[in-house]
């Protein structure tokens, strides 16, 4: 059953220790680079925790280039992350966009990505977090957002459809993500009734 106490919070130095603990327990907010990304985050935090927190809200894309799975780098997009919080750290959800358009660079797999820590899964937190993030995304003036999933990630697909998402296409990700990596593209409209009000009991993540 969904626990309604979960909310999205702006990352802070006060809540950072629980984020660090999750990384050390093997969780990663990056569903593709996984352990490599977790190690990078831990290194950044150890070097300058305040700077790491500041990078979590980067509407002007000043945080430096982004590293792709093959080690190549690409310019950062404007974006920000929120942490899922129910009195404890539950996971992360991020939103990125190109100002003035719904289009994304080909290397960018969707506007929104999320990851729940394993010990908080099964509470519907990803479904609720996505709905809450859609409300924030709507403020950027986009008509829709796109998300991508692996073809076999049924749980994440339910999170998306539970927030009004519709399937768009099956495609292959850029070579930087690995040869012949299939992905599914989904779209959620940000016009009309807010999808964040729909289906919050349907997701299992």
Where are these regions (language model features)?
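GNAT-family acyltransferases
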Residues: 1-111, 118, 136, 176-205
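Loop/helix-junction capping segments adjacent to catalytic residues or to phosphate/diphosphate-binding pockets
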Residues: 16, 123, 154
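Glycine-centered small-residue hotspots that permit tight backbone geometry or close packing
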Residues: 110-113, 159, 165-169, 179
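Conserved acetyl-CoA-binding loop-helix of GNAT-fold acetyltransferases
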Residues: 113-116, 122-139, 158-162
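Conserved GNAT acetyl-CoA-binding A-motif
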Residues: 137-148
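Conserved beta-strand-loop-alpha-helix junction that forms the acyl-donor binding cleft
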Residues: 147-157
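Conserved catalytic-core motifs of GNAT/GCN5-like acyltransferases
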Residues: 148, 166-183
């Amino acid at each position: 059953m969904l626990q309604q106490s979960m909310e999205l919070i702006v990352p802070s130095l006060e809540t950072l220790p629980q984020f660090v603990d999750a990384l050390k327990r093997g969780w990663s907010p990056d569903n593709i680079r996984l352990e490599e990304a977790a190690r990078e985050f831990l290194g950044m935090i150890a070097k300058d925790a305040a700077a790491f927190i500041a990078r979590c809200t980067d509407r002007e894309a000043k945080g430096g280039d982004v590293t792709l799975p093959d080690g190549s780098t690409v310019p950062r997009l404007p974006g920000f992350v929120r942490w899922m919080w129910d009195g404890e750290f539950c996971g992360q959800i991020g939103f990125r966009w190109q100002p003035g358009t719904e289009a994304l660079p080909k290397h960018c797999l969707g506007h929104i990505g999320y990851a729940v820590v394993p010990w908080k899964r099964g509470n519907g937190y990803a479904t609720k977090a996505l709905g809450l993030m859609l409300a924030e995304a709507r403020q950027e003036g986009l008509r829709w957002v796109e998300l991508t999933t692996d073809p076999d990630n049924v749980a994440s697909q339910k999170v998306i459809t539970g927030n009004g998402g519709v399937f768009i296409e099956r495609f292959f990700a850029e070579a930087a993500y690995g040869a012949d990596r299939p992905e599914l593209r989904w779209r959620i409209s940000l016009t009309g009734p807010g999808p964040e009000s729909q289906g919050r009991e349907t997701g299992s993540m």
